[in-house]
């Protein structure tokens, strides 16, 4: 039962689900700064700083790099509706919920969609994309999910990007659960359109969607024969607001821009390479601890930011998650689609990727599972995590 005061003053949680992640105190303080007008010279300067920081985190020189007012789903729609006109052919790789969502969005905007579907928990092989491009040579856009949040799958990208580039199609990438936590060199991989969310590895509240478009993508937009179907997400108008013209388009979420700028500054202060290494280390610690309890991972290529694991046989998925929340204040995610009731998703993103988070969730899970009748060796998980941490530190020294 939720107490009435919890509705007025929400409780402090340890956010270790598929998102949002814990938010840094500095970011929360930035949210509380005075609200400015959306064309105030000071706010326009903050927008410029945010763009510069986004370019660094995306590792791109793309001129059109900005934050869409909306969540990652708005970023997805913005990328699709600006690149696709009715009748255009698009290949979409579906390895989980969010590949399926991209397919749905593309169809709604009139694309002729050709789908590459693989079993949940697996990734798309480059050969599949090469075969599909050969079968559909008029393909304009190839869309795939870099970090499939529903399965914890990490999609290898380099070879795929080379195949798509050689064909001449545009590469659209969902990086909602990877930007700021997993390597994502946009320019090096020749990604033409990429979108993310603020609430995952950037550890900012949800509400903005960072996006970036290559020169090739802008050229495709400029050659459109029809207007972009969405007025709100029309990048030709948003470009004028975020660019030098400063033409009014809509009232931006001012304070969320403050928060995003602060979150990006935190990323750059840590350094992208160190941040990615931190996510890798804590993933290895968590994985070692879970496997010491006899818990198996789902994906063949696991994300370091989102850990998808099988619920042990005979264990009540919802009951364990409820006990984690009520007894320890820890939130983890449930399974989706074919994994509903059969999987847990444990996020280690941004502020939520720390030694404290790993040891807390392992200790809590171990205690709860033991009382639920699951056979395990108490203390084995934390010992395994500590050993994995030591191995990671030795590897860094070497």
Predicted regions and their residues:
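Active-site C-terminal subdomain of aminotransferase-like
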Residues: 22-23, 199-288, 292, 397-398
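Conserved PLP-binding catalytic core of the aspartate aminotransferase-like
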Residues: 296-327
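Active-site phosphate-binding strand-loop segment of PLP-dependent enzymes
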Residues: 123-180, 193, 201
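Conserved N-terminal alpha-helix of the aminotransferase class I/II PLP-enzyme fold
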Residues: 30-78, 97, 101-107
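PLP-dependent enzyme catalytic core of the Aspartate aminotransferase-like
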Residues: 338, 342-398
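N-terminal "arm"/small-domain region of PLP-dependent enzymes with the aminotransferase-like
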Residues: 1-41
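Conserved PLP-anchoring active-site segment centered on the Schiff-base-forming lysine
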Residues: 84-100
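Conserved active-site segment immediately N-terminal to the catalytic lysine
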Residues: 187-199
